[in-house]
């Protein structure tokens, strides 16, 4: 709202969000002030799913931390060379729209077990992709990796201390 107020005297006519969610924009306030709000709901889906997958590989194999160590002139192969395989691990996807579905397909392709939570159930998608919907508590308890692709609906944090307490030790959260 502050940015909208500051721009009102200019030729400012539209806010465009490069992505799906509009939770960081006061849409009603913008509309009340004659400013259109647009987003790009389809454009980044594949890229975001690929990036989430890359983050999982990076965490599983210590790629980022090992790279940083090497740039500092250290060779700590024993410390960072072990890692874990993603195959056989469970990925919980919170938000099973376009991005979540693409990520689920990628994860299944490398042998991960995948479960999903979404407040909106898309008819037939469980059977089509072979990825079951589960309740949030079950997803939190059984997942080795959790990838979040949904905004908090109540304005609070989607992943909070209460939900973290329900997760496995060592879980990796991708957001």
Predicted segment positions?
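Glycine-rich Rossmann-fold phosphate-binding loop(s) that bind the pyrophosphate
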Residues: 96-97
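N-terminal Rossmann-fold NAD(P) dinucleotide-binding loop
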Residues: 100-101
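Phosphate-coordination loops involved in phosphoryl transfer and adenosine-cofactor binding
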Residues: 12, 87-90, 161, 170
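Rossmann-like adenosine-cofactor binding region
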Residues: 119-175
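Well-formed, non-transmembrane alpha-helical positions, independent of function
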Residues: 3-6, 28-29, 85, 125, ...
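Phosphate-binding beta-alpha-beta segment of Rossmann-like dinucleotide-binding domains, i.e.
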Residues: 33, 41-90, 105, 109
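Conserved beta-strand positions in the Rossmann-like core of class I SAM-dependent methyltransferases
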Residues: 115
């Amino acid at each position: 709202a502050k940015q909208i107020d500051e721009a009102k005297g200019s030729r400012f006519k539209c806010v465009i969000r490069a992505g799906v969610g509009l939770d960081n924009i006061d849409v009603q306030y913008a509309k009340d002030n004659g400013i259109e709000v647009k987003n790009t709901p389809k454009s980044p889906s594949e890229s975001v799913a690929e990036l989430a997958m890359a983050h999982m590989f990076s965490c599983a194999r210590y790629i980022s931390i090992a790279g940083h160590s090497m740039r500092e002139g250290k060779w700590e192969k024993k410390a960072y060379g072990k890692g874990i395989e993603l195959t056989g691990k469970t990925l919980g996807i919170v938000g099973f729209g376009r991005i979540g579905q693409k990520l689920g397909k990628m994860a299944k392709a490398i042998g991960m077990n995948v479960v999903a939570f979404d407040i909106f159930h898309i008819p037939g998608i469980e059977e089509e992709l072979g990825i079951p919907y589960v309740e949030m508590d079950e997803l939190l308890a059984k997942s080795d990796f959790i990838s979040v692709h949904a905004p908090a609906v109540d304005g609070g944090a989607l992943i909070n201390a209460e939900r973290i307490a329900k997760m496995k030790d060592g879980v990796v959260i991708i957001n």
